[in-house]
């Protein structure tokens, strides 16, 4: 029987271990990047939803030519924003699925800083009370700025988060 003519088929154990090590290292780095990206997406979406809510309140104020207030209600870990005709009409509790309220959707986005508990939008000339609200998580910190003329915009405070520019 001839045994010297055999061709090798398959991979050696050492080759398999090297390939598995390389794949594990690349997957670990990719997983870390993916988690950071998800955190940035959650922060950006929460800030955009808050901006949309405040824009609706501002548009409603301008449409009816009335002053509207938005009250910020921090309740421990939870927080929400409640819209009303004035500060006394705003509810004191956060409820899910209420059209006049903005409730945060993710647990990891926290309210970092704010200038006042009450933000006012004036129907006359579409003006507003100036202020800002900062939201943060492990991906960074975003600031929603409200100017006296009623302009609202988002900016990143310390580092660029996705496509939102620095303040």
Regions found by a protein language model. Give the residues of each.
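Alpha-helical hydrophobic helix detector
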Residues: 17-33
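N-terminal helix-rich module
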Residues: 2-8, 29-48, 52-55, 59, ...
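Internal alpha-helical transmembrane segments of multi-pass membrane proteins, especially GPCRs
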Residues: 9, 14-18, 39
